[in-house]
Amino acid sequence: MAGTEAASGSQTATISTEHTLTTITTAGVYMLRVDVNALANGDRLVLRAKAKARTGDTTRQVFSAVFEHTQADKVVDSIPVPIVHELVWTLQQTAGTGRAFPWSVLAL
């Protein structure tokens, strides 16, 4: 079965602000893809996935990845994250100049 795009957009980062890219409530396995071509030396980007263990639980971090400076790979993928209740993808730039990051969430 081929993957489909569950959500997409572009986020211009405000330094130190954690931006919510999308919240998914349909059970499945999802992966975040982000174009990091805009990163420059001195920039630091954090991508996070947060999920609930059960319906009424608090959403908590299940994955994070940090990218610093110019990247050799201009598009980066998260690990696949299976969910039943809720999945929240966030982007936070913690250093450098705020950049615009095109992104897509793929349903696998």
PLM segments and residue spans:
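Acidic/polar N-terminal loop/beta-strand segments that form early-domain functional surfaces
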Residues: 35-37, 52
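Short, surface-exposed beta-strand/strand-loop-strand elements in extracellular ectodomains
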Residues: 42-55
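Surface-exposed ligand/attachment interfaces on beta-rich extracellular proteins
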Residues: 1-26, 38-43, 58, 71-75, ...
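Low-complexity, flexible helical/coil segments
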Residues: 38, 68-71, 83-88
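An anionic, turn-rich surface loop/hairpin at beta-sheet edges
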Residues: 62-79
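Acidic Ser/Thr/Pro-rich low-complexity disordered segments
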Residues: 53-63
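Low-complexity intrinsically disordered segments
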Residues: 104-108
